[in-house]
């Protein structure tokens, strides 16, 4: 018996089972009740004809051949196994593909990481070279500056040694000027310390703080006014000194032309 005939027989068998399941159950037998029926002249009712029921027939089995249901069941199982095996194979193929993609992704990440590390190494090496170059240039400039300072000091020492005795007087005058400047600076600090009084306002109330602030403001305003007046006075004095010096210079020029030099302070000395 061929596979097609077996499948045909199997389909007919399945159709027969489905028809039996869908067929309604046979009506229950109603006992006959003998009652007297009175004849009534009524219109005749049309009796509904019962629908013909499908006749169930057993599947035709070809004569001379036997159906092997075990063989059919075995083929079904083999078919299911083949489908299951196909699903398993497709699952493993997809899994293998995902693993390959994951491996490729890891390789790309490692490659990118190595490239980034190489770039950082090159950048660090260039930065180190730049720092070394800057350090060398700085050391060279410092060496040149030290050499130039040494040469300048040597020239100064030679010039001062050539001055001879005037060097000691020069140092004495320089020390004297420094002493005067130091003394004036110390006097200024002393005067400022005397004038500057400590500001104790922790115990003052709000009104007294306002009064104190107004007092300080008035003092500051007065100081600024005095400063401005002193500045204007100093400007006038400088202007007067400049005019006097110009007059003295003109008088000296006229006296030189006349041949006689008047007595006056010239070059810091009286003549």
Swiss-Prot record:
Please give one Gene Ontology molecular function term for this protein: troponin C binding
GO BP terms, alphabetized: regulation of muscle contraction; skeletal muscle contraction
Q: Name one GO cellular component term.
A: troponin complex
Q: What is this protein called?
A: Troponin T, fast skeletal muscle
| Lineage: superkingdom | Eukaryota
Bias regions of kind Acidic residues — which residues? Answer: 1-21
**Designated gene of the protein:** Tnnt3
Which UniProt keyword terms apply here?
Acetylation, Muscle protein, Phosphoprotein
List every position bearing Phosphoserine: 2, 90, 161, 168-169, 205
Q: Which residues carry this modification: Phosphotyrosine?
A: 221
Tell me any Pfam family this protein matches. Answer: Troponin
Give me the stretches of Basic and acidic residues compositional bias: 31-53, 62-74, 113-155, 183-194
Residue positions where N-acetylserine is found in the record: 2
Per the similarity annotation, which family is this? Belongs to the troponin T family.
- Region span, Disordered: 1-74, 113-194, 248-271
Give a short account of what the protein does: Troponin T is the tropomyosin-binding subunit of troponin, the thin filament regulatory complex which confers calcium-sensitivity to striated muscle actomyosin ATPase activity.
């Amino acid at each position: 018996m061929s596979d097609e005939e077996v499948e045909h027989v199997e389909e007919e068998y399945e159709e027969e089972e489905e028809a039996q399941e869908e067929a309604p159950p046979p009506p229950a037998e109603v006992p006959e009740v003998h009652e007297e029926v009175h004849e009534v002249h009524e219109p005749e009712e049309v009796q509904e004809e019962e629908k013909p029921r499908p006749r169930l027939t057993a599947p035709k089995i070809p004569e001379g051949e036997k159906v092997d249901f075990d063989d059919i069941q075995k083929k079904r199982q083999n078919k299911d196994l083949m489908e299951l095996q196909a699903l398993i194979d497709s699952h493993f193929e997809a899994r293998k593909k995902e693993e390959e993609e994951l491996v490729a992704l890891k390789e790309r990440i490692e490659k990118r990481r190595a490239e980034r590390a190489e770039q950082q190494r090159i950048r660090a090496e260039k930065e180190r070279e730049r720092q070394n170059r800057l350090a060398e240039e700085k050391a060279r400039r410092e060496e040149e500056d030290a050499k130039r300072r040494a040469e300048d000091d040597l020239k100064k020492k030679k010039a001062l040694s050539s001055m001879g005795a005037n060097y000691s007087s020069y140092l004495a005058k320089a020390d004297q000027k420094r002493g005067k400047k130091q003394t004036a600076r110390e006097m200024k600090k002393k005067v400022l310390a005397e004038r500057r009084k400590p500001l104790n306002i922790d115990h003052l109330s709000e009104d007294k703080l306002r009064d104190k602030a107004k007092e300080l403001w008035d003092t500051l305003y007065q100081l600024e006014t005095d400063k401005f007046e002193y500045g204007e006075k100093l400007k006038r004095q400088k202007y007067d000194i400049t005019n006097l010096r110009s007059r003295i210079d003109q008088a000296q020029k006229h006296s030189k032309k006349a041949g006689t030099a008047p007595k006056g302070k010239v070059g810091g000395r009286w003549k």
